[in-house]
């Protein structure tokens, strides 16, 4: 693979010289600023060999570098080895930003040109790059080229998978109602139209689903909401007859995907809300300047607050998912002891058990099965090249989830397969303590995730441990497993936590080359009480699956923490046992015994 990457970079540099570029920047995104993208837009992976979901690759005529976050440090070091790309660790002291690195690398040039594809870089990203490099005097930015159009000769086509209806029994609100709410919010912020580019927002507001992006039930399209009209820009071959009839009944006009630029140029309204931080440069530039109203799409916040139907759907999906997970856990240890199991075989077994459940549509992300040292790679994915046998000792970390018609799941369990070291047991218990502290907390309405993040970290901080990823993210309703705008993380995120939002609780500790521990449940934010000091919120734990008690150092848990775990396990048993029989039911009984 390293030979292939070096050959590709060599061809890119030849192309750059021929077309007047000194450097080119490759983000992870697509024209819709998606976190996970269709294969057609995996340009950064193609040029660098780095397969993680987040990262930016930069190639100059002499050097190459790749920026990514802590979830991928270990994986990136392995994948970039021998490629000539230098790993730049984001949010680590001493790591330059992309623009700082470019300014240094290009300082000896009398005139340098940095390329960014305007179709996959946001308007805000391009503007920031231009501003940061403008002070150097010798560097300009161009957005009018995509080298992949010439170099990536076997590039996958833009997907044309069929779109399907997402019925009211699962969505809980009609498209017309959602559009009315959107239009009201637009009036409140002084705009009369909205350009929607995020694929999950389009799917949500139209009550449609697709399969254009692996594990994400979305479809490639744009949506333009004006005072009188709604226009969906999409390849017409993706629409079966029932979807066409539905769109017609909702008075939604359908135009070709490629015609969106022309539609924006001819926009007849007075002002169009455009999110410059997520809308690609080419699209944002097509809107007449005098009609641009810069702001954030209201759909993300609307989608994040689940209605009653969606909340009940999550509960039902978590119940079925819990049954599948328990069947897997009941099988796991004896299967490992019998021999022949690997990380990939565990992944396949868990997916097969989920597929037996009603309303299963697929996995919600590529399953992480990390045995021992692989568990320390936060977003590890076993491949035939990295797959290892799973032995009856140590820890295995399994982070997995599924897409069901009525909800999306995300769960992590770290399982003791046999004898553990004292360090493994203490680390496991610290992670569990943090998980429990966050789950038990109550907080005032209006609080943001960063204001409660420390609860999950405090137990491990006291013993000198930490983790560099976020503690929690929103989860879509048969949509993307990662959604915002809210998060629970150390860095400030201004989106308040609201009743009806889903969010994960997933603290962890990772010791490179040794092992990793993460415990994750998906939670629903619900009202707690109202006092003289205002309204307070709390969490309802949606995920139903035992937390392994074998690694716990019991004396490290407080009375309240033991009580929480026992109560949770009682609820897990009462909820899941009616759907289990024989050995699996008996295994669950033992796994949920009080400690």
Regions found by a protein language model. Give the residues of each.
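Active-site neighborhoods and metal-handling regions in enzymes and metal-associated proteins
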Residues: 1-595
């Amino acid at each position: 693979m390293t030979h292939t990457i070096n050959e590709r970079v060599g061809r890119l540099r030849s192309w750059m010289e021929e077309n007047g570029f000194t450097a080119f920047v490759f983000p992870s995104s697509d024209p819709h600023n998606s976190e996970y993208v269709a294969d057609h837009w995996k340009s950064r992976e193609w040029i660098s060999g780095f397969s993680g979901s987040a990262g930016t690759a930069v190639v100059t005529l002499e050097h190459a570098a790749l920026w990514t976050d802590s979830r991928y440090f270990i994986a990136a070091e392995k994948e970039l080895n021998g490629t000539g790309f230098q790993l730049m660790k984001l949010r680590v002291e001493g790591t330059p930003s992309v623009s700082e690195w470019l300014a240094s690398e290009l300082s000896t040039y009398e005139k340098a040109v940095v390329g960014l594809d305007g179709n996959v870089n946001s308007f805000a990203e391009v503007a920031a790059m231009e501003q940061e490099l403008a002070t150097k005097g010798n560097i300009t930015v161009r957005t009018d080229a995509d080298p992949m159009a010439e170099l990536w000769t076997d590039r996958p086509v833009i997907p044309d998978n069929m779109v399907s209806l997402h019925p009211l029994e699962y969505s809980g609100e009609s498209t017309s109602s959602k559009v009315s709410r959107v239009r009201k919010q637009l009036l409140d912020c002084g705009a009369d139209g909205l350009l929607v580019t995020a694929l999950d927002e389009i799917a949500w507001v139209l009550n449609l689903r697709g399969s254009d992006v692996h594990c994400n039930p979305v479809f490639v399209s744009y949506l333009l909401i004006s005072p009188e009209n709604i226009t969906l820009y999409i390849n017409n071959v993706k629409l079966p007859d029932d979807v066409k009839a539905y769109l017609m009944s909702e008075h939604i006009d359908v135009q070709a995907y490629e015609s969106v630029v022309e539609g924006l140029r001819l926009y007849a309204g007075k002002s169009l809300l455009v999110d410059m931080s997520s809308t690609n440069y080419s699209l944002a530039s097509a809107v007449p300047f005098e009609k641009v109203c810069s702001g954030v799409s209201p759909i993300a916040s609307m989608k994040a607050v689940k209605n009653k139907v969606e909340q009940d759907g999550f509960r039902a999906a978590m119940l079925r998912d819990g049954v599948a997970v328990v069947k897997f856990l009941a099988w796991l240890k004896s299967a490992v002891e019998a021999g022949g199991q690997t990380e990939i075989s565990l992944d396949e077994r868990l997916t097969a058990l989920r597929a037996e459940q009603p309303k299963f549509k697929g996995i919600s992300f590529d399953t992480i099965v990390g045995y021992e040292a692989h568990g320390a790679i936060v977003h590890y994915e076993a491949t035939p090249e990295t797959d290892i046998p799973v032995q009856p000792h140590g820890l295995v970390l399994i982070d997995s989830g599924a897409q069901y018609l009525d909800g999306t799941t995300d769960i992590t369990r770290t399982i003791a397969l046999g004898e553990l070291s004292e360090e493994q047991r203490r680390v496991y218990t610290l992670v569990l303590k943090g998980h429990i502290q966050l789950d038990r907390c109550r907080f005032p309405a209006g609080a943001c995730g960063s204001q409660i993040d420390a609860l999950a970290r405090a137990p491990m901080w006291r013993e000198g441990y930490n983790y560099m990823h976020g503690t929690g993210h929103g989860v879509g309703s048969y949509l993307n497993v990662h959604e915002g705008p809210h998060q629970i993380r150390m860095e400030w995120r201004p989106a308040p936590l609201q009743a009806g939002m889903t969010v994960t609780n997933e603290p962890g500790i990772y010791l490179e080359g040794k092992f990793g521990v993460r415990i994750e449940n998906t939670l629903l934010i619900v009202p707690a009480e109202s006092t003289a000091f205002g309204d307070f919120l709390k969490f309802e734990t949606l995920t139903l699956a035992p937390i392994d008690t074998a690694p716990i150092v019991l004396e490290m848990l407080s009375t309240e923490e033991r009580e929480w775990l026992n109560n949770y396990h009682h609820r897990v048993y009462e909820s899941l046992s009616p759907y289990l029989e024989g050995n699996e039911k008996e295994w669950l009984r033992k796994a949920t015994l009080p400690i």
